[in-house]
Amino acid sequence: SSDLDGTAYLFWRRRMAARMTDDWQHLTGDTIVMSTARQGYSEGPVMFKRKGIYYYIYTLRGNQNYVNAYMMSRQSPLSGFEKPEGNDIFLFSSIANNVWGPGHGNVFYNEETDDYIFVYLEYGDGGTTRQVYANRMEFNEDGTIKTLVPDEKGVGYLAVSQEQRENKALKASFSASSVRSPRTSKVEIETQPNCPLADKTSLVKVERTHIYHPGNAGDQSNGTRWMAETNDDHPWLMVDLGEAMQVTECQFAFVHPAEGHAWHLEKSNDGTNWQPCAEVKEVKACSPHVATVGDKVRYLRLHIDKGAAGLWEWKIY
């Protein structure tokens, strides 16, 4: 983070903070521990300034009870922080919206329009999904942050969408070599993290089930995915467009993209006779992977040769 005078600061886990040199290459001065109203392990801090107030956001707990709390200061990025009036934990799980454990993230803002967006991860199940969420922040007249209820609506495009083509996958049908069995998670969520009830009645038992149906790859939702069975040695996902139509390219958003994938794509007009279409032979880490088709086809079949056997999204243009 940098202040209006150009001074840069670094904030990191366990509430550590320090001033940086002008070239942003080194720390300078003393390393301090940020003062917070609540204790406990914390990581992924955020510092930003709005209307003369410095905000220090820090995380607490974890798993399904991951939360974000904050402190306020009118002095400097490293001093004068006090607990805000009212609830200092402003973001926590929403059972109604099916968002569990909203964790650390960052604030993006436009000072001219006073638009502030908090982008964060969801703990999800087992800490392995960690999908990215975004919600708009709102403030009270005194500068305190209003409680942010997490949801899957997002904030929409902040500019005109660069993609104007029709996604043919939305009207297609999907099938697969196998489908992973549904996974049900049962947890207890603290519904009043700012002031938990002593009798623990604010702890609510909830459960949710993830279904890995092939059609999830074509619903244009980054919250659902297709997964093959763990013992599927040759996983594939096939799409039927209903009739032969011109396809320019396909975009694949694989599960665990940072681990990389190798794959090959086939095309067909009868679902029986297949021809090679595109491939990535060596494991490549990126998202999305793009396959050039440039042909009139009805069926497409994606074989995952290496990498996690799952797909968040398959877009077809």
Sequence positions of predicted segments:
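Beta-propeller and closely related beta-sheet repeat lectin domains
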Residues: E43-V46, G103-N106, H289
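Disordered, acidic Ser/Thr/Pro-rich linker "stalks" and the adjacent N-terminal cap
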Residues: Y157-E243, V255-A258, E279, A285, ...
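A short beta-strand element within beta-rich, extracytoplasmic domains
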Residues: M245-P257, L302
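Beta-rich carbohydrate-recognition and catalytic domains
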Residues: S1-G40, K49-Y54, T59-A96, E111-T113, ...
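Extracellular and analogous surface-interaction loops
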Residues: F48, L237-Q246, T292-K296
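Short, conserved beta-strand segments of beta-strand-rich sandwich/propeller modules, principally
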Residues: D115, E249, V297-R301
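Trp- and acidic/polar-enriched beta-sheet ligand-binding modules for extracellular glycan
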Residues: N231-D233, P257-Y317
